[in-house]
């Protein structure tokens, strides 16, 4: 009952988002499921709090014992970077990272400031399409990690920024026929349900541990098309049982609502 109510509430939030303007994801699951090697590409939003890819790997280890992807999940990050700052040509080369011949899935995370102006959004759109094309040409799959928005006291806080982020990431996914992972929406819905929860650091931009945990749950649910609810992983007890279940349910309901909106 609790999960059903949460899903219905999030569905209402989705109805008031940019989806009212028919901006909905066209791709709702990976064309080739269960990727055995995954590369995260982004900035400090990924590497804070022991790195999102490590939390994600531990969830994969728990859900799929012996799954090869658990040792083939890597991350390439540059602090403060935007999409254009990453050398995809190099990252896609065989054994550019470890002994991995080819990453079956490449998850792209853009910079926090790429939605602040029309010029920035256009540059993001162009780079997103270029990167996705390179990834697909390599025989890999591309996915876009929709970032969270700023919160106060960040100087660029704007309550409507998440709508801009949502629209630009959905457009990037639709233009390249790539999966979009709705991390930013999960943050929004978590705050709607529990305004007191701390998903951001004090700077209003970087994720706190609970933010990274929520993001990992959202990526897990999106990539594997499976619910994270019930996972035992709690980062060695640093995520409380209450927070763990809440964030797992938020991730599950966000992903279900986002993909069902199309």
Positions of PLM-derived features:
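Sec-dependent N-terminal signal peptides
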Residues: 4-13
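A structural signal for well-ordered alpha-helical segments within the folded catalytic domains
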Residues: 50, 54, 209-221
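Bacterial Sec-dependent signal peptides at the C-terminal "C-region" and cleavage site
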Residues: 14-24
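Conserved SGNH/GDSL esterase-like catalytic core that processes O-acyl groups on lipids
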Residues: 37-38, 46-125, 129
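Conserved catalytic region of serine esterases and O-acyltransferases that act on ester linkages
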Residues: 206, 216-262
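Short N-terminal segments immediately surrounding and downstream of signal-peptide cleavage
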Residues: 22-42
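Alpha-helical cap/lid subdomain in secreted, periplasmic
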Residues: 95-209, 221, 230
